[in-house]
């Protein structure tokens, strides 16, 4: 497994390096270098601390989903933490969909079918997106051009949740798929995926998970604030609002771009908005973007690689592919929600 992932991670790292080079060429390299030299590196512990707060709370959300769907049998809290952290190595995949790796690892640990647990990753991404929309909404008055896309994402998210909760329509679609050629093979796992997804988007779970996401991602918004403070920007509530809006918007735009890790889109959005809203010169804005990306995205990828290496040794993932095991039907297709 690790041998297959290494190539993908290396490609993502190369893309990330290319983004750094392009940003450097687009900006004044001397200004960027000067900004790094002037940066107050004593801010790094606070920046990484708030990033770790985000990771910790998101792990709680992952574990909350796991226990609510009765899929955590045989998985200790520590193992759950390693499992969650290992998924962060796939944060550089398009839309973070590669984090379904957690489902394969969970199958190895306790036999939970991938089709049953994969919707947890979908629910994580959806609630993260909703949290980003809420955080971004706090600063919409700062940047009116972002309003149309914000409205579109709100409508699309609401429509998707409503459609998934409308069971007759979804069951009709699944029945049609089952009657198609080869549909008999994919309809059962799709039904399992739908049942898990529908329960995960039940309003009480949705509200709790979204609330956790808002608090967790606000931690990284505060990390962005400390990056700007490290570059010498005077502290103020306005600066915190700008940091929250810029980080949330750039992360969200990167997510919906479906580029690996949002690479390129997130960086360009963040740099451009910092220039307009702080305001600050292009060189320092580029430095701020690079620092926050290394302290969030790439920090998480590094932690994920370490956690995955531990799990690989523990479960010998390189020696054998995980075998598919089945749960009892009532656990796979009828997860509990209370």
Segments predicted by a language model, with ranges:
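Interfacial segments of multi-pass membrane proteins
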Residues: 106-114, 268-284
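Transmembrane alpha-helix interface/packing and boundary motifs in multi-pass membrane proteins
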Residues: 50, 86-95, 246-267
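Membrane-embedded alpha-helical core segments of multi-pass
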Residues: 98, 131-138, 154-157, 220
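Transmembrane helical bundles of ABC transporters
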Residues: 60-64, 68-72, 77, 97-105, ...
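Short intracellular "coupling" helices and adjacent cytoplasmic loop segments at the cytosolic face
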Residues: 73, 85-100, 105, 197, ...
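Membrane-embedded alpha-helical segments of transport systems
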Residues: 86-94, 115-140, 290-302
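Membrane-interface alpha-helices at helix entry/exit sites of multi-pass transporters
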Residues: 77-80, 100, 112-123, 280-291
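Predominantly cytoplasmic-facing regulatory/coupling regions of multi-pass membrane proteins
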Residues: 1-85, 142-254, 280, 286-290, ...
């Amino acid at each position: 497994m690790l041998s297959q992932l290494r190539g993908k991670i290396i490609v993502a790292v190369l893309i990330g390096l290319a983004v750094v080079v392009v940003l450097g060429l687009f900006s004044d390299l001397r200004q960027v270098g000067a900004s790094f030299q002037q940066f107050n590196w004593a801010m790094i512990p606070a920046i990484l601390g708030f990033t770790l707060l985000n990771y910790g709370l998101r792990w709680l959300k992952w574990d909350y989903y796991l226990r609510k769907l009765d899929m955590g049998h045989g998985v200790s809290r520590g193992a759950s933490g390693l499992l969650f952290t290992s998924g962060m190595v796939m944060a550089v995949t398009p839309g973070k969909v590669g984090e379904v790796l957690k489902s394969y690892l969970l199958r190895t640990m306790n036999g939970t079918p991938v089709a049953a647990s994969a919707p947890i990753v979908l629910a994580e991404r959806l609630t993260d997106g909703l949290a980003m929309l809420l955080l971004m909404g706090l600063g919409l008055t700062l940047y009116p051009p972002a309003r149309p896309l914000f409205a579109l994402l709100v409508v699309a998210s609401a429509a998707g949740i409503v459609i998934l909760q409308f069971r007759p329509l979804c069951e009709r679609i699944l029945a049609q798929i089952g009657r198609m050629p080869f549909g008999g093979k994919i309809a059962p796992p799709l039904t399992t995926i739908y049942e898990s997804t529908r329960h995960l988007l039940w309003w009480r779970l949705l509200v709790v998970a979204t609330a956790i996401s808002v608090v967790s991602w606000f931690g990284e918004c505060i990390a962005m604030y400390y990056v700007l403070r490290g570059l010498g920007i005077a502290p103020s509530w306005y600066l915190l609002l700008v940091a929250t809006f810029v980080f949330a918007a750039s992360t969200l735009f990167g997510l919906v771009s479906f580029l690996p890790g949002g690479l390129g889109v997130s960086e360009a959005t963040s740099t451009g908005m910092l220039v307009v809203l702080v305001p600050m010169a292009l060189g320092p804005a580029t430095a701020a973007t690079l620092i926050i990306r290394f302290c969030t995205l790439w920090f998480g990828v590094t932690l994920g690689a370490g956690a995955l290496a531990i799990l690989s040794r523990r479960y010998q993932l390189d020696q054998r592919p995980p075998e598919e095991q089945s749960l009892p039907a009532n656990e796979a297709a009828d997860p509990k929600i209370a």
